[in-house]
Amino acid sequence: DLIANPEVKDTFVKRSQILKEIRAYLDEKGFLEVDTPILTPFEIGASARPFYTHHNTLNMDMVLRIETELYLKRLIVGGMDRVYEVGRIFRNEGMDPKHNPEFTTIELYQAFTDFHGMMDLVEELYKRLAQKICGSMVIPYQGKQIDMGHWERLTMIEAVKKYSGVDFNDWATDEDAIAAAKAHNVELPEVPTKGAILAEFFDAFVEDKLIQPTFIYDYPVEISPLAKRKPDDPAFTERFEYFIDCTEYG
C-alpha cells in the first residue's frame, strides 16, 4: 500500500512532522514532556473499558491505561507548572472511523492560567501547525475548505440558540426544558435537568454543523462534574472543547 499509494506514505510523514512541531511549540512555551505509567494496578480516570493483563513477577492483575489525566495532574500538584505527554491510550471498546482501541493522545496541563488562556494556546498551536506543515491557513479536506486562521468561540447556550433557535434562558424550570425537548424530538437524558437537556440539544443540533474551527465553552455542571464551576453561575463550568469538521478534537 505504501509503495502503490504515495498519499498513504505522506500521511505517515505529516504525522511525524506534526508531532515534532507540537513538541517544539510546547517546549518553547516552557512545558516539560513527561512519561506516565502505561501499566497501572487499578482502573483510573475515564469510564472506558480497559484491557487487562497480569504481572507475573508481582503476581497481580494490571490494566493498560485508558487516559493520562490523573498522573499528569499529580505532577501539577507536585509543583511542575507546565507538563505534557504524547502517549498511547488503550480502550477495549468498539471500532469505527473515529474510534480505535489503541490511539495517541497529546495531553497538557498548565498552572496559573484559566480556560481562556488554554483556548488561546490551542488556537495558536493549530495555526502554527497549519502554516508550517501545510503552508497555508486554509486546508482542503474532503471537499471542504477548513480555515485554521479563524476560530469561533461560543458558549454552549449561544451555540444551541444559533443552530436550533432554542434559548436556554427561556427555561425557568426542568419541566420547561423537558417540554422543549419533546417539542423538538430531542432525546431526554436519564436525569432530565435543564443542563443535561441543553447538552442533548447540542448533540442533536450543533455538533454536525461545526465545520470550521470552533470552541464551545461553559458546559453544564451535569456533564462536567470534575470541572471548575463558574463563579458567577455555578450551574456551568469553566470547560471548553473544540471542533473541526464536525469532530471533537479536544
Model segments located where?
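TRNA-binding/sensing appendages of the translation machinery
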Residues: D1-F51
